[in-house]
Design a protein with these regions (language model features):
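Short helix-capping/turn signature of helix-turn-helix
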Residues: 66-69, 115, 128-135
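Hydrophobic alpha-helical connector segments
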Residues: 78, 92-122, 173-177, 202
Length: 220
C-alpha cells in the first residue's frame, strides 16, 4: 500500500493533538481509504476522482473501497469532510489554548493558514473542492457548512482580541480575514513576475489581519 503524501502540517506554537483513541480494524481501513482519496482528489482533480482511482492508489480492489463508501458522491463528500474538519479542529484547539494570548492565537492561525495556502497540493485541493461544489449538491452543502464554521472560528478569536467589538463587527472582521488569506492564495498561484515578493505579501497580510481585529482599543 502506498503511503499518504497529502497531510496538514502541524500548527507551529499551537497545542499538540492527543493520541487517537483505539480504532477498530474497520475504522482504520476507512481512514486509509479517506487518506488515499484526499491524495487522489488533490493530484487528479474532481473530474478524474473515482472509487476506482482511489482503489488503485491503495492497491486494493474496487469492491474494498465500495464496501466502505458505496458510491462516488459519498466517497467525495466524506473525503472533503475529513480534510476540512482537520483544519477546523486544529484551529479550534489553538483558540481554546490557555497558554496563548488572544493575539498569539490569531497570529498562529494566520501563520499556519498562509503557510498551508502556499503549498501546491493544498492549493490544488481547495481549487478542486470549489470547482466540485458547483456541480455536486452534497459537496456544496458541506462546503457551506465548513465555511460557516471557519468564519465563526475567526469571529470568536477576533472577539477574544477585542471584546468591545459588536457581534456583527467581529463577524465582518473574521470574514475579511478569511477573504484576505484565500484571495492571496489565488493571487500568488496565478501571479506573474510582476507580483510583489512573497515575504512582503505575507508580512503585510499578517498585519492586515491583526488590524481588522482592532477598533477603539488595543488588542489583547
Amino acid at each position: 500500500m502506498k503511503t499518504r503524501k497529502f497531510q496538514i502540517i502541524e500548527v507551529d506554537g499551537g497545542p499538540r493533538e492527543a493520541a487517537p483513541e483505539q480504532q477498530t480494524p474497520r475504522d482504520q481501513r476507512k481512514r486509509e481509504v479517506i487518506a488515499a482519496a484526499i491524495d487522489v482528489f488533490a493530484s487528479d482533480g474532481y473530474a478524474a476522482f473515482s472509487a476506482r482511482s482511489v482503489a488503485k492508489k491503495l492497491e486494493v480492489s474496487l469492491s474494498t473501497v465500495q464496501h466502505y463508501f458505496p458510491n462516488r458522491e459519498i466517497l467525495l463528500v466524506e473525503t472533503l469532510r475529513e480534510m476540512g474538519s482537520g483544519y477546523i479542529e486544529k484551529y479550534r484547539a489553538t483558540i481554546d489554548s490557555q497558554e496563548l494570548s488572544p493575539t498569539e492565537r490569531l497570529q498562529i492561525i494566520v501563520d499556519h493558514l498562509l503557510e498551508e495556502t502556499q503549498r501546491p497540493d493544498v492549493r490544488a485541493f481547495f481549487f478542486q473542492m470549489w470547482a466540485s461544489a458547483q456541480h455536486e449538491p452534497g459537496v456544496r452543502a458541506l462546503l457551506e457548512a465548513m465555511t460557516a464554521d471557519y468564519r465563526l472560528l475567526l469571529k470568536n478569536v477576533v472577539r477574544q482580541i477585542t471584546p468591545a467589538l459588536k457581534d456583527e463587527e467581529a463577524a465582518v472582521a473574521g470574514t475579511l480575514i478569511a477573504a484576505q488569506i484565500e484571495g492571496l492564495m489565488v493571487m500568488t498561484c496565478f501571479g506573474d513576475a510582476s507580483l510583489p515578493k512573497m515575504k512582503l505579501l505575507v508580512s503585510r497580510a499578517k498585519q492586515v489581519c491583526l488590524d481588522l481585529c482592532v477598533q477603539n482599543g488595543k488588542p489583547r
